[in-house]
Amino acid sequence: MKSLSRAALATGAAVFALSMLPATASAQSGGDGDRPSGLIQTETHTQVREIAPAAGAAMTVAATSASKQLNYTQQVQQYDQWCWAADGSSIERSMGGTASQAQFCAAGKGTSAGYCPNQPAQIYEIVRGFRGTGFSAQDAGGPIGFSSVVSQIDAGILNLTGIYWTSGGGHAEVIYGYDSANQSIMVGDPWPTYQRYQTWNYNQYRSNGQFRWNDTIVNIRKG
């Protein structure tokens, strides 16, 4: 049986696009079969983590809020292996930072400010990218529970996720909202031909026929 495309799977998971941005010349995809692969998996995490917001994070809505969506603008990645750099820059700019994709990439890879290779990253390098550009961040060591998504978003914190294709390779996305009524999460994606803003059922995002959520960077804060 032919496997479902990500677009078809997304439709089945109540995924929809709020906007579409044009592809850049250096990050164009050949189609849905050409999967983004800008993330390197170093460990397999099977345990769902429950993570409290970092000390000092301000709760922005009441704990009983049914849904919450943070103000977030998802950039398109400038190179085919820069999903993580696009997400890092997008998160920081949405939270008051100024780092470009190239600057975030250089901080994560430890290269000079004017140069960063088009290479995939490991989670620790993305955490280093945040810390090297004036932010703090924490590796959760796995996917986080829906209640942790709620508490992070309610505290005004965007989360970077690492998903890994069953066919190999990985991709970075960003959680920017939730809806408790149907246990769904709102996800930003930097790949040029994918829907920029999506909504996924939490359990289906955790694991499905095409990918598995394995990593999360949480408690991302400026300063």
Per-segment meaning from a language model:
Residues 21-23, 79, 171:
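Generic detector of short, well-ordered, non-transmembrane alpha-helical segments enriched
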Residues 1-28:
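Secretory targeting and sorting signals
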Residues 67-112:
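Active-site nucleophile-adjacent alpha helix/oxyanion-hole segment immediately C-terminal to the catalytic cysteine
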